[in-house]
């Protein structure tokens, strides 16, 4: 259940079509249905977010008490709204600092979550990293396998990407990986469902 942020104005700016209330409702529903290992992803460095916005988000997550939190540093992808419509966002502040990351780490520690994985990728805000935190026994094994590209992913829906990883190693120790992307346009996806 990935809010990205708990600031509604930011969700609106970045084109996310869920609300903070829907995130909270979804989390509570999942808990009531017996889900006992819920991960929540946040993104640091989103437009117009400052340290107080990060604090607000972490306080709301602390109330929900997830089992696992991943703190991502903003990395603007080629097809992301922030890149495609960059002229709209040029004047907006997008900052991720060590202070933001430290604040998140402090809140995670207060919630009994410890870091269990870290990874970096190209173009991350503030030259920071992504860090996964988890309660004892609640680490997101999926997250680690995905970062190490050791897990096959079967994806459904417009714009999704399936990735097949062969478990037999190549002579050089690497693994064969094949990707298959579904068309992004929902109408085309529906019309071509048998091809996907």
Identify what each model region corresponds to.
Residues 20, 109-112, 182:
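Short linear sequence motifs
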């Amino acid at each position: 259940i990935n809010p990205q942020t708990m600031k509604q104005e930011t969700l609106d700016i970045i084109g996310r079509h869920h609300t903070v209330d829907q995130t909270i409702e979804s989390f509570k529903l999942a808990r009531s249905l017996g889900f006992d290992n819920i991960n929540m992803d946040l993104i640091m460095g989103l437009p117009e977010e400052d340290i107080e916005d990060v604090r607000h988000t972490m306080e709301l997550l602390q109330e929900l008490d997830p089992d696992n939190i991943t703190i991502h540093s903003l990395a603007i992808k080629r097809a992301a709204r922030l890149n495609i419509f960059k002229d709209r966002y040029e004047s907006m502040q997008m900052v991720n600092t060590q202070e933001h990351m430290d604040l998140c780490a402090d809140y995670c520690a207060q919630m009994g979550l410890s870091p269990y994985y870290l990874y970096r990728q190209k173009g991350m805000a503030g030259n920071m990293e992504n860090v996964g935190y988890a309660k004892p026994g609640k680490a997101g094994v999926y997250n680690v396998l995905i970062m190490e590209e050791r897990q096959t992913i079967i994806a459904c829906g417009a714009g999704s990407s399936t990735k097949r990883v062969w478990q037999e190693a190549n002579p050089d120790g690497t693994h064969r990986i094949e990707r298959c992307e579904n068309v992004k346009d929902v109408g085309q996806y529906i019309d071509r469902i048998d091809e996907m």
